[in-house]
Amino acid sequence: MTEGKSIINANLTPLPDKVGVDGLEDKWRAVWDEDGTYKFRNTRDRKAVYSIDTPPPTVSGSLHVGHVFSYTHTDVIARYKRMRGYDVFYPMGWDDNGLPTERRVQNYYGVRVDVSLPYDPDFKPPFEGTDGKKIDAKDQVPISRKNFIELCERLTAQDEKLFEALWRKLGLSIDWSQTYHTIGQHPQRVAQKAFLRNLARGEAYQQDAPGLWDVTFQTAVAQAELESREYPGFYHKVAFRFEDGTPIYIETTRPELLAACTSLIANPNDERYKQYFGQYVYSPLFKVKVPILAHPAAEMDKGAGIAMCCTFGDVTDVEWWRDLKLPTRPIIQRNGRIVMDTPDWIEDPAGREVFAETAGKTTFSARKIIVDKLRESGDLDGEPTPTKRMTNFYEKGDKPLEIVTSRQWYLKNGGTDAKLNAELIERGKELEFHPDFMRVRYENWVHGLNGDWLISRQRFFGVPFPLWYPVNASGEPDYDHPITPSEDRLPIDPTIDVPEGYDESQRDVPGGFTAEKDIMDTWATSSLTPQIVTHWAEPDEASKALFASTFPMDLRPQGQDIIRTWLFSTVDRAHLENKCLPWAHATLSGWILDPDHKKMSKSKGNVVVPNEPIEKFGADAVRYWAAAARLGLDATYDIGQMKIGRRLAIKLLNATKFALAIGREDENHHVGAAAEAAWNPADVTEPLDRAAMAKLALVVRQATEALESYEHSKALEVIESYFWQFCDDYIELVKNRAYGTPDEHGNVPSEKAVKSARTALGLGLDAFARLLAPYLPYATEEVWSWMHAGSGSVHRTAWPVVDPYVEAATGASPELLTWAGKAVEQLRKIKSEAKVSMKTPILSVALSAASEGVEAIHAALGDIAQAGRVVGKFDLVAKHAEESAAEDAPETEVAVEASELGEPPAKKPKH
């Protein structure tokens, strides 16, 4: 296609006899791959580049239509920006490390890690796929950490091939040469380099502290990974006793923690307990002496108003322990069971016997034992009463979290630093949220932080911390003086690599070194995706050029549910490292709901595999359903919408073929020859054609404004609405004139009038191919190839601008087309109500409309009469506004006052 001074020159190809959407995906995907249609060139400066921080999907089995939904939103913007002339940097990543991957590998291969085992180079797993069934830990074969990591890498590689095939089928305009993996060598180097720089600046630190712990996954959990869920339990009214035996009652849902009690706490303003502050009582069963203390966090209206503080039952216990400098009395192990050895602080012989009965038990079993003992001792007042309480869970876990003291790594995020918190709030104000109301979720999260980001995990498949620790003469690691590698050695695995100045023989021996065995939380890597994809801090010239042209990035698309994790953590990392936002815009998609309006998720078992609707309706149809949904709002999985999308794609093919065939068909309606056309806006001379161009100019302007504001659904609505009007009204009105067909009286349209119609049709369908290209990439590429042979992909063509359509309209009102369409609708209604063929002639008719309508209809009267087969008198009656109101005029604004039908055409005999 060439376009100069608004003239669009077209190279028209022969047209297929039959059109359809089937087969288009394979055909055009192969062409795009061969031509490098979506390849990032990186030949221009930063202003000419549009860079997207694409969400790397978690590689843990399969995708569902929710992924298709949100990734389509991103692709629409990517395609639009490419057509606006940007060199679009649109990579894809795979989030292939972390707990979901480990869990899948355990179940898929039937294995688990035993760090004491040596590497077996010939190991073969006992299973190769278990159809998603969970294999019990007792049936899993223990293997070395290295063997386990190899299985993780093998399985994620298989999954990634399936994911890529799906994304390609959906038509995502990804540059696949820019693909990355969060466990790959390059991302590991970026994550380790960023951590070492955080450490050097004092932003990363380690600490022995109570923290949330998942007993199933055997790892610490960060605040951002919590889910608060309703959990059933029982309130137990339990007596602590003063020296003289007088009871004071507390109510608890966790009596199994009585042995860990350090104090009783009440609110300083609670008149019931003021007299007891500073006094001591003894715990039931264990006879441990504990003080009664005051703290404002105690809730006077909860339970008895006085609570026991155990180390640790919940986060409030941690707050009290820290503020009141209470002793630490942990009794729960990392596996969720009671410790085996009776604690020293329990001195009473009977108490030690009770504890011994609970040793090694699960908290559930220990609770039962303690409650029975409390009944026997008379310290349980009444029977336990059922309750439901909100309890913290790891978002991927199925058991309540415990609080365990352990050594962990933290990264500053404003949870303990008011200055940093304020700075991150300001970053949120700089960021353009789409929709804007999502900004408050970011601000609420940052304001509500109560601790720094815990970034260490006690797992196996992830990015290792690049650290070792000196081992002193007594064989104890010196955690206060970590040994770090130089950046040019990264990435490293400290369990395999050796620090400078040491050799392997010094590992884990006095006077030697020991490796940091924890790995980074998967979000600690994912939070660096902008730095990973843009090759931040890499020394080679190509990486430097890439970073300069793509960072800070333009767009972060993501789900609304991970604002607190992925979005915030990425802002935090860029603020600390780059002193700027990582991107200018963030688009937040809603959730996909099932037909019962419940969130679709793999854990709920209500997901739809995306291959199914794509196979059934086509990729363009599924994309249409996704793109019709507004950002930030939930949408229902709707097959009806997909059917509409398929119909839209087919209509585009049919309408374009029809218009391009005019004047080129042989007697068998076959178009077998190529042709050239020049669609010059100056050749649009007829009122109806000009009105169609005026409306097109308006649509181009509105769609462009919407997409510039990231309102892809609004743009689609505007484009689609006019496309159907263009097909149903405009093409029907002008097709006879475009063909040069004589009217009922034998009058042949002028050459000028014919050319006007054909030019407007060409300009219109050329524009619709481009306007719909971000939404229906396959159907638009097909029709574009019919119009502009040899000119390349529609997806590398310029987005329409209003100029040629404004020029063609020459001041016409788009309302003329609307009125003409309403008039034809009334003519059709005459025949449909009479139940006769649409080819039946109308001998005479009188239509009434408002004055402006009469004027518009009159300007297009010839086209309207021919479209409606009006062969005789065609009168127009103007109605004043007061008259229309008095008669309660129908909403159509055009009405039939009188009509007379002729004889229906004779039916052709069947052969």
Swiss-Prot record:
Reactions listed under catalytic activity: tRNA(Val) + L-valine + ATP = L-valyl-tRNA(Val) + AMP + diphosphate
Keywords per UniProt: Aminoacyl-tRNA synthetase, ATP-binding, Cytoplasm, Ligase, Nucleotide-binding, Protein biosynthesis
Binding site for ATP: K602
Pfam families: Anticodon_1, tRNA-synt_1
Protein biosynthesis among keywords: yes
Keyword Nucleotide-binding: yes
PROSITE patterns: AA_TRNA_LIGASE_I
Major site of localization recorded for this protein: cytoplasm
Enzyme category, top tier: ligase
Domain of life: Bacteria
Protein location: Cytoplasm
Assembly mode: Monomer.
Family: Belongs to the class-I aminoacyl-tRNA synthetase family. ValS type 2 subfamily.
Protein name: Valine--tRNA ligase
Gene designation per UniProt: valS
